Structures are given as structure tokens and as C-alpha cells.
Amino acid sequence: MGYAGLKQLIEQNAWREAGRELGQYMNGEWDDELAVLAATVFSALGDWEGAYTCIAQGLQYNYKNYELYLLLGNYYERKNCNQAWLCYENALYYCSDEDDRRIIQQHKERVQQDDRWCVHKVSIVILTYNLKDMNMQCIGSIRDTCAPSSYELVVVDNASTDGTLEWLQEQKDMTLVSNQENKGFPAGCNQGIKAAEPENDILLLNNDTIVLPNSIFWLRMGLYEEERIGATGSMSNSVINGQRIEAKLAGVEEYITYGTAMNIPMENALEKKTWLVGFAMLLKRKALDEVGLLDERFSPGQNEDVDLCIRLNLGWQMRLCHNSFIVHYGHGNGRNSYIWEQTFSVTSEKFREKWGFDMSYYTYSRKELIAMISEPKESRIRVLEVGCGCGATLAHIAYEWPEAKVSGIEIQDDIAKIGANYLDIRQGNIETMQIPYEKDTFDYIILADVLEHLHDPERILQKLLSYLKADDSILCSVPNILNRHVISDLLRGKLEYQDAGILDRTHLRFFTMDSIVRVFERCGMEVTQMMATYDTEELDAEAEELMNALYQIPHIADRQLFQVYQYVFRAKREREAE
């Protein structure tokens, strides 16, 4: 497609005329050439957000277009010299025209004169243990997608026996540490970090990954978004902690296509996180130097990434980069699922011994409650969560509703301190504290598995109602004491409290669907929306027989109610309920 008239106006610096000329193309078919021209015009007219939109659209068509990264650098120069420099570095990587390379280099050098400029090269630390083909694919993907000047490879081999070590020894572009025994993940990573250039940022990367175009570029852009960001992490197809994409695709090739299309400029790309999974975690060198290396008590591996992030939370913040996708097979380093589960159990206990709490208990994002928020994503909602843990649910709300203002109350002091590092979280006991907010403030108050811990749930509901706007909602979840596992045990004379679950030893109150509805009714509220989650664990044969007999008793509760694990619901004041 030709744009001769538009190009001529740009060459003449006739920007207003160019803007009018551009109008005839805006609703037609786009390509990356038009995106370059449009972004150039918008930039010249001072419409930087319009320029950004055009750049993002152009990179959808051609992620290798160096002119778009040059324009993206111009966009960031106004606000962040480090991110601008990274864009110019990426433009150089994709540019083969020598004249244009000189221009881009001049941009880089100019930005480097800024006193605030401080960008470090990345040392990519990879551990290998057999799986030769996978190792070759991982390392090859880095070579194929990253500017050679932007990184160094540091590979730690944990005594491979399948030819991996011999192949690594033939490579000329990496630092190799060769162990005579398998030292595990934390110790191996520490060896790699120590072998890296001392000023470099560190990317811990699993060997069962495929790096896609711009995966690491956007991790670095996220890391330098703010000075206090100490670590960034990627999205993937196989990962926990809210880092897995929702799309279910057929295989690796489809994920490569999907991920490549994701790795472009994105509005609201960064989500605040309490911790990041270590399969692909980029660490700012200054932050790592402050908090120290991975804790080798977690060898052979699992939970060392959570531990590192807890230490980072004492002064640094973490971000999940939604526009950085890395394919993850999820079974590298020679682990199988049984060994993984056994190791995770052992290292989780070590984590509890070190920190005094179970991290998974306090960092779970309650997406089923978030799904009950009905306001448009551009709304300026106010949300309070009581019993917010480290703030995972609040952080995800703040990501999904960028204009939202979220606040939390957490009873555990050490947990509240972690969350307060990146969100408005206050420590306090909701049953005794003065709530530090104005009345009639919140659109939503969240009580996720809280009421069962209270001495007087109805008094607290009445207390919280005054902080809720007149026509807005409480979002709540409670475990179901009528669950078949609990009832079958009771009928056999058993009642054993647990560390977590329906019979959590800290529970003071128990609810059925009917009883929790009545609690809210007595507080002048009506449950307007309810859903249930069901347990999938099979009963033993004796319990199954007992429950089947119970179901036959006249006037017994509906059979389905015994299968419910938890109720999740939304409630409003009765006078405002529709």
C-alpha cells in the first residue's frame, strides 16, 4: 500500500496537514508502515498516547520493525530514560540499515548522558541436568530472539550424563560451570549468579522454556518501570501464581504463535505481585545484592523463589509482565510429578519453620469473588478487603480495574507488613480496631473466609455496613459445614481439626447455606448472587455407604448440598436490593 501524499507532508514537516491526510487511512486496513507514519505524525502533534497506540498496533503486524522501537524510545524519553534506552537497543537489534543504525546509536548515546540513566546487561542463568534436546532448544531460543550485546549466558550443569555437558563444552558464547554432582536448584543458581558479571541483572530461567521474540525485552522494560521494582516475571502456559494464561491451545507451536503476538506494547501491562515463580524471574542486581542469594536450605528446589521474594518485599516490589510470554514445558531439570510433590511438601515445611507462616495461605487470589464485581473496568471503584493476607486479591483487582483504589486489613502483623510494601494494607483485628476509613466509602467490602474466624460475625457485619456505600455490596465466602466428608466423619464419631479447610483449627463459627443467608438477613441484607464450589475428593467405601443411607431419610437436606465445599456470594442492603 502506498502513502505517497502522507510521506510528502511528513518530509515537509506539515504536521497538521499530515494529520488531516492520515484521517483517510485510520479506519481502513493497517500495516506496520502506516503505523510508523501515523505514530510519527501523532508524536509531532504532541499526541503521545495516540502515537503509543499506533506503535502497538504496528508491532502486531511486524514485531521486527525497528522504526517502531525507535518511535517507542521517543515516547519513553519523555518519562523514563532507562526504558527509552532499552527501546533504542531493541531498534538496533532489528535494524540492518547502516545509516539508520548510526541515528539509533546517537539516540542511545544521548540518553546515556542523563544522570538518571542506569541500565545493566542481563546474565541469563540456566541450570541443566540431562534433557539435551530441551537445553539446546532453550539456549537456541535466546540466541534467536535477543540482542547479543544485551545479555550473557551462564549455564550450570548439574552432572548431566546424556551428552548435555559435552554439547555445552563446545559452545563459545557462554560461561559454563560444571558440577560433579547434582547440587539442586538453589545452590546451582547461586553458582551461576556468582559466575556472572558482577554488575549484571540476573534472569533465572528454567531449561524447559522457549524464549520468544521480545520476552526478555519486556521483562527488562518492566524492571526499569520504577526504581523500587526489584523483580519481574513472565506469563506462560504452565505456571502457578496467576501467571498462566487462560487460553488452552493445542501444542507448543500454537503457544509460540500466541506468545509472540502477546509480546508487544500493552496498556496496563504490569501487575503488582507478592511473589513471582522462578521459572523466568528477572532480578535487579542492586536488589539481589541487598537481600542476598537463594536460600540453599530449600535444596533440591521449590519455595526458594517464594523465600527470595519475601526478602525482596522488605524494600522492593515485584511486577508480573502480562506482555512477556515464555513457553514452559513444566518438567525440566529431570523432575517428575511425584518427586516434585514430595519435594514441595518438604520445602513448604522448611518455609514455615523459617518464616512462621504458610505462604500459599496468604497469597491466594480469590478470582471467584473478583468475578462478582460488575462495574466496567474503567470504573473508579473503592474496595476494602478484611483478612486480605498479603494482598493478592486486592492487587489483581487493581490490575483489572486500573482506576480502582484498594485497601486491606490483615490481623497478622508480619503478613500485613509484606502487603503494605506495595498496597494500602493496615494491620488490625477487625473485631477490636477502629476502622481507619471514612464512612460510606466503599463500593465493595470483601470477606473471603473471614466470618468463620469471628466471635460475633453479625456485629462485625453491622459495623462494616456503615463503611459501605448505600447501594453497594459485600462479597463473601464461607466453608460449608454440611459437606459430606465432615458429616460422614461425624456420623462415625470423628471430629479432627486441621491446619486448613472446613475444620480449620482457627474456625470459631460454622455455616450451612441456610444459616449464612439468615445471618445476612438479620443484618438487614439480602443475598443477591450465590455460587458454590464442590469438593472432588472421593469418599471411602464406608463413608459412601453411610451417606447413601443418609440421603434416604425423609426431610433430609438436598443431596447436592452435602457436596458443596464452599459458598461464594454477594449481598446488598435489603432496601437497595433489586
Give the location of each predicted region.
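N-proximal low-complexity "stem/linker" segments adjacent to membrane-targeting elements
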Residues: 89, 93-141
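Conserved N-terminal segment of class I S-adenosyl-L-methionine
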Residues: 137, 333-440, 444, 458-461, ...
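Short, acidic, metal-binding catalytic loop of nucleotide-sugar glycosyltransferases
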Residues: 140-150
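A conserved acidic beta->alpha catalytic loop
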Residues: 157-166, 181, 388
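Glycine-rich, basic loop-to-helix element that forms the pyrophosphate-binding segment
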Residues: 178-196
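Conserved donor NDP-sugar-binding/catalytic core segment of glycosyltransferases
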Residues: 210-249, 480
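S-adenosyl-L-methionine-dependent methyltransferase catalytic module, highlighting the catalytic core
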Residues: 243-244, 267, 296, 455-577
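A recurrent flexible, glycine/aromatic-enriched loop bordering the glycosyltransferase active site
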Residues: 252, 260-286, 501
